[in-house]
């Protein structure tokens, strides 16, 4: 039995988001309102098993307070999934998740992530290689979508019929839809019904525009989900996992104080050459918002190019 079985029902998961859910932001979220489970940014196994490995290891940084965390992997070579999975337990991760849902064109044009929906032979090989490496040590999960260009529940059937996935996280849109149309949560209910008949032990997690805990509890109850994944919601409210968020009442000083803490932890965590400054800009609208002259301060922040300039702009 994996640790996933001991999580509350429904359990709440911080979604993997590239250049967002690094160790620094995960620690900020934990301090605000801790999710039951967290996923890393997706990291490329083919890069990790190459001479360029050192440029990717920052995505697998982990602090002692981050428990439990699952590492999310993507790539094309099953052997590299095997090798990377073998390393993960020793790094402190509690599980491995396979990205088969990212719809970004630069990723799918190479046949990875959501493109695997249309390449089930390779998808199966990747799952098998990962599961073999994980053994009884790490639970294996997949994060995906309900189809590539159109809804295709045979893809969900395929994944469930592997009989070896501990968890399946499903974004209730196709890859083609990206985030341009509302998610169809009824498809999550269909996935649960398929799970019940094909793989009763696989946990089903719903994803797609679920903004906070209250919303997630409604969706989980309606569709009998085991868990709920929140992604972009934390970029609107760092207390998204709280039963009741204090964020709407927070004023300028509190919000900027939390942003300064974020930046200072960024400085403390990464060596100068280890991670670029640019990802910090993704958090600008989260923290610099909801008070007078916020737009002017955001504009000033977006023109900064170093952490020192960024901190200075927050005190101007």
Language-model segments: residues:
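Active-site beta-loop-alpha junctions enriched in small/polar residues
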Residues: 17-19, 43-45, 74-76, 101-103, ...
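Alpha/beta enzyme core
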Residues: 31, 82-96, 100-110, 121-202
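Alpha/beta catalytic cores of nucleotide-metabolism and tRNA/nucleoside-modifying enzymes
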Residues: 1-8, 12, 18, 24, ...
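An active-site metal/cofactor-coordinating segment within enzyme catalytic domains
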Residues: 53-54, 61-63, 105-116
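Short glycine-enriched, charge-decorated loop/helix-capping segments at active-site entrances
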Residues: 111-117, 177-178, 245-248
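Glycine-rich, positively charged N-terminal anion/phosphate-binding segment
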Residues: 2, 17-87
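Hydrophobic faces of well-ordered beta-strands that scaffold small-molecule active sites
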Residues: 12-15, 38-40, 69-73, 96, ...
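Conserved phosphate-coordination/catalytic loops
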Residues: 75, 117, 121, 182, ...
């Amino acid at each position: 039995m994996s640790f996933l079985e001991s999580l509350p029902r429904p359990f709440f998961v911080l979604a993997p988001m590239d250049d967002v859910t690094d160790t620094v932001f995960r620690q900020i979220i934990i301090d605000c309102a801790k999710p039951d489970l967290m996923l890393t940014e997706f990291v490329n196994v083919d890069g990790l098993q190459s001479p360029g490995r050192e440029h990717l290891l920052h995505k697998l940084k982990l602090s002692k307070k981050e428990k439990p965390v699952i590492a999310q992997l993507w790539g094309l070579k099953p052997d590299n999934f095997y090798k990377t999975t073998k390393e993960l337990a020793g790094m402190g991760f509690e599980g491995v998740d396979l990205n088969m849902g990212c719809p970004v064109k630069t990723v799918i044009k190479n046949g990875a992530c959501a493109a695997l929906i249309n390449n089930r032979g390779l998808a199966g090989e990747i799952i098998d290689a990962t599961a073999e490496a994980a053994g009884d040590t790490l639970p294996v999960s997949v994060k995906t979508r309900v189809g590539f260009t159109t809804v295709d529940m045979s893809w969900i059937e395929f994944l469930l019929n592997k009989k070896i996935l501990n968890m399946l996280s499903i974004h209730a849109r196709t890859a083609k839809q990206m985030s341009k149309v509302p998610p169809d949560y009824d498809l999550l209910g269909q996935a649960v019904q398929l799970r019940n008949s094909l793989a009763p032990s696989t946990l089903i997690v719903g994803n797609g525009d679920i903004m906070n805990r209250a919303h997630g509890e409604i969706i989980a109850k309606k569709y009998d989900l085991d868990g709920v994944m929140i992604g972009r919601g934390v970029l609107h409210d760092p207390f998204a996992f709280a039963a009741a968020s204090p964020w709407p009442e927070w004023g300028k000083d509190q919000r900027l104080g939390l942003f300064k803490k974020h930046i200072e932890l960024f400085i403390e965590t990464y060596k100068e050459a280890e991670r670029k400054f640019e990802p910090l800009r993704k958090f600008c609208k989260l923290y610099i918002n909801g008070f007078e002259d916020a737009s002017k301060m955001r504009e000033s922040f977006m023109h900064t190019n170093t952490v020192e300039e960024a901190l200075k702009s927050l005190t101007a």
